[in-house]
């Protein structure tokens, strides 16, 4: 019998149907419950998992590692200094070697093409832990967190504030509209999402009944907001743009004034982390000294408020990643969704 997920890679949200994406979210909730009750779920007993990290990570590495162990698999971390992707060895050759030694591969790096080549040539499921274009495993955690708080996804309005061109904004647009979530991007015109991403999201929205709004008008952006979401102003590899981004994005900071504009006491705040909400980091101190800004994309007040759900969201990275690995590699009985 054909299995829906077995052997498939998880590279971008657009590769999955609404039903498939929603199934993974619900399966994640089930695995979270099993974990909470101490029920073993060793669906990947005896499997070996390669964790390839071109870009450093706290949550993604921790989530994949603990998820693999919970599933009975052995995770092996291979950092930027351990792998030769495209340097001394082609991605194709590396993929073919790793595919003979490992049962599944996670990749977190810069190029979407690279993760696609790993999937094409390795012969095993490959999971995208983040590229410059997409962040699909983050989306499962985000929308699971939203569903936990509201009991549904369809009809919810999510407002993303900040750099509208980054991977998180791209993925929020596509995954959200795929599942009937209204997605507002509140961003300066210079950082509006790419036109092809917006068109893709609008196509999904037409099918799901959702709507897409890309605007630099705060009153338009916050209308009907159930979820405020933000991300760092400067992504990995863009550190030279700090001054430009601080000046450009200060009006798009998530603060209590913005929260109150939504006039919804039941709304929640999400952030994929890390967050620059104070000066308790080297980056935070550096930005404060150079630009006079002590809080960047979110104020400390909002970050620590009753609206905040980002630590639930971070925990959900592990449960959702576990669901993806189990569904695609665990030979589970999932004939259709």
Curated annotation (Swiss-Prot):
Pathway listed: Amino-acid degradation; L-arginine degradation via ADI pathway; carbamoyl phosphate from L-arginine: step 2/2
Keyword Transcription attributed: no
Residues annotated as binding carbamoyl phosphate: 57-60, 84, 108, 135-138, 272-273, 317
Location(s), subcellular: Cytoplasm
SUPFAM superfamilies xref list: Aspartate/ornithine carbamoyltransferase (SSF53671)
UniProt keyword annotation of Cytoplasm present: yes
Residues that hold L-ornithine according to the record: 167, 231, 235-236
Cellular component annotations (GO), alphabetically ordered: cytoplasm
Highest taxon above the source species: Bacteria
GO molecular function terms noted in the UniProt entry: amino acid binding; ornithine carbamoyltransferase activity
Keywords: Arginine metabolism, Cytoplasm, Transferase
Matches recorded under InterPro entries: Asp/Orn_carbamoyltranf_P-bd, Asp/Orn_carbamoylTrfase, Asp/Orn_carbamoylTrfase_sf, Asp_carbamoyltransf_Asp/Orn-bd, Orn/put_carbamltrans, OTCase_ArgI
Catalysed reaction equations from the record: carbamoyl phosphate + L-ornithine = L-citrulline + phosphate + H(+)
EC number: 2.1.3.3
One of the GO biological process terms: arginine biosynthetic process via ornithine
Family named by the database record: Belongs to the aspartate/ornithine carbamoyltransferase superfamily. OTCase family.
Function recorded in the entry: Reversibly catalyzes the transfer of the carbamoyl group from carbamoyl phosphate (CP) to the N(epsilon) atom of ornithine (ORN) to produce L-citrulline.
Protein name: Ornithine carbamoyltransferase, catabolic
Gene: arcB
